[in-house]
UniProtKB/Swiss-Prot annotation:
HAMAP family: Choline_dehydrogen. GO terms for biological process: glycine betaine biosynthetic process from choline. Its EC number is 1.1.99.1, 1.2.1.8. This is Oxygen-dependent choline dehydrogenase. The gene is betA. Involved in the biosynthesis of the osmoprotectant glycine betaine. Catalyzes the oxidation of choline to betaine aldehyde and betaine aldehyde to glycine betaine at the same rate. PROSITE patterns: GMC_OXRED_1, GMC_OXRED_2.
Amino acid sequence: MSQEYDYIIVGAGSAGNTLATRLTEDEGVTVLLLEAGGPDYRLDFRTQMPAALAFPLQGRRYNWAYETDPEPHMDGRRMECGRGKGLGGSSLINGMCYIRGNAMDYDNWAKLPGLENWTYLDCLPYFRKAETRDIGPNDYHGGEGPVSVTTPKAGNNPLFHAMVEAGVQAGYPRTDDLNGYQQEGFGPMDRTVTKNGRRASTARGYLDTAKKRSTLTIVTHALTDKVLFEGKRAVGVRYLIGAAEERVEARARKEVLVCSGAIASPQLLQRSGVGPAKLLESLDIPVVHDLPGVGENLQDHLELYLQYACTQPVSLYPSLLWYNQPAIGAEWLFNGTGIGASNQFEAGGFIRSRPEFDWPNIQYHFLPVAINYNGSNGVKEHGFQAHMGSMRSPSRGRVQLKSKNPRDYPSILFNYMATEQDWQEFRDGIRLTREIMQQPALDPYRGREISPGIDVQTDEQLDKFIREHAETAFHPSCSCKMGTDEMAVVDGEGRVHGMQGLRVVDASIMPIITTGNLNAPTIMIAEKIADKIRGRQPLPRSTADYYVAGDAPVRGKPLREVGPTAQ
């Protein structure tokens, strides 16, 4: 039996939930939203408590837990590639950092043929439309959107303030809003958390409104096998429910919208016969349309941590001890406050490591505890760390189908650290971070350098540390890029080249990765394209000012000059 809808959306992540909500605002428009994972159980603290962000990455209930092929420039490591599974997608398991990217990211996209209306001032109204910021709207921020954004408050951990001050003392700008007039510099970091201290996933922000509409049908545990075509027109999808092998078909009167993310969107297109013909033929998949860019141009952010012992008992180390956790959990559960109500990434920054970068190429997240992002290898003492990563690596990877079976994972290769620029940026980044960490603001707190450690100094030693310890920031993107060149997959409205009734709308359509975390840009992209699908006039361009570094020096004179090996 085949059901019929106006639109079928594959993937209930940050983009899919945005589209499902906006499309069903129009009376009578019917939407089927398919999600391979399960519901977002509101009583599961693992996905609802911000401070528990490491938990959903463990196991496979909420995480696809992909792995890369052996990465050739990383000692052949198979690197983890976590992706969200369940209503909310990766917004259900991410670190909740609300970072939009740099204005220059979007202005740069808009220089590409066919993407002229992706300038920052074209995108800013859609960032605002999606957002409700807890301290109210302004030219940069929204006050009525589905995404709850919480700003850091006075009285939070003193290490956040010390780390920002250290960045300023090292000669970098101070910014009061990393999503406002000026991204460059050090300052407080906003988070997607509700006023009650809950994770603000897109399932909570968007679907809680939309699922009350009779025109929206949500099916969980629905793994899409393929998009169905008549000629070059997408007319529906075929999917599996749970562990059953029986295929269910649904028809789309208007469009099929693929919102499965930078790994699964190209995988689904390839399985459906849209992709590089040679690859499809090698797997006996009939070619519907030869599109060589599907799965190519894959990008990500790589990062590593510099960890320090803390000489005062102000870090979050006690919260890692089991006997302190019940009280933290109770305060969060009943009051929505306390340590549990924050992702603990409440300060960060963006800098240019060299003058040839026109906008920041290094991002910092500061964390007032020394531990791996996935919750492993917690240092058994008071400590703090800086996450440091490069933003626009020239390295490019790919996603390739390995079989026709929808349950099989694809072959993923990011090709991390494939260029000399990558190594230069990470070496510079480690050395600049050490200089920041040696500034007077951290004197009351800074103990020994735990990692990499004082003996890791030469280029060769740093490179070895990077190869062994750098890890993904979980920002895969760009594998179905927008544009008009021969490797582009979609146009500036997400429509797949050479096809009718088929769009891709998610982080995979970014042509070049943005400067920062990807959840906010992904929601913006979906908000913007939703207006196109609905035939609405785009929101008027913003007239807000924004910072362009121009000839400004990368930084001023540091308060404390630090020699290359000083610790």
